[in-house]
Regions:
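Cytosolic regulatory regions built on CNB/CRP/Popeye-like sensor folds
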Residues: 1-191
Length: 191
């Protein structure tokens, strides 16, 4: 990762990015020396507060993931019953966004907006391919770490869906109960 500031600042930013990449909120499966190799394929990007840098449904972006180094990112999406975005998560330093779009080349599944000025390290699909060609073992470990993160999110979403299904069933039963009670309490229809 290169920046336009002094060499000492660049080295510190590089090391911070590598440390954040190994944090539990990112890719805990990578060792620090492996993270340093990955970070060498990333490029820094400043994103102004209020900027949506990943748009849900966008199929035409360059395909990248971002490691948040500083600032906060709001992840949101449009649900079936809403026209306004629903905030899914607020992420800070050490968090990754965009991993799905990096690997699957499909339309983005959520939007990401900088809620503050954000500094992040970007890994593009082309840079990932170069990493895999130059360091296949580290590239494979990176992809496995990304897959593990995505699997954990999938499990979390499955738990939430089970909870929502139970809630919907309970609400349906309550609605039936009160509907039957109201029908029994209503006066008989006039002839």
């Amino acid at each position: 990762m290169t920046t336009t500031s002094s060499s000492a600042d660049s080295d510190a930013a590089f090391e911070r990015a590598a440390e954040l990449l190994t944090a539990p909120s990112a890719l805990v499966h990578l060792a620090l020396d492996e993270a340093r190799v990955v970070v060498s394929y990333m490029s820094p990007r400043w994103i102004a507060a209020g900027t949506t840098f990943i748009r849900e449904g966008d199929a035409h972006d360059e395909g990248f993931m971002a490691l948040v180094l500083d600032g906060e990112v709001v992840v949101d999406g449009i649900t079936v019953s809403r026209t306004e975005p629903l905030t899914i998560k607020v992420l800070g330093p050490g968090s990754l966004v965009g991993e799905v779009g990096l690997v699957d080349q499909e339309p983005r599944s959520a939007s990401c907006t900088a809620s503050t000025d954000v500094l992040c390290a970007i890994l593009t699909r082309d840079a990932l391919q170069a990493l895999i060609e130059a360091s296949p073992a580290i590239g494979a470990k990176l992809l496995l770490a990304i897959a593990a993160n995505l699997a954990e999110r999938l499990r979390d979403n499955a738990r939430k869906l089970r909870l929502y299904a139970k809630l919907a069933k309970t609400m349906h039963q309550e609605l039936e109960h009160y509907t039957l009670a109201a029908l029994k309490a209503a006066p008989p229809p006039r002839a």
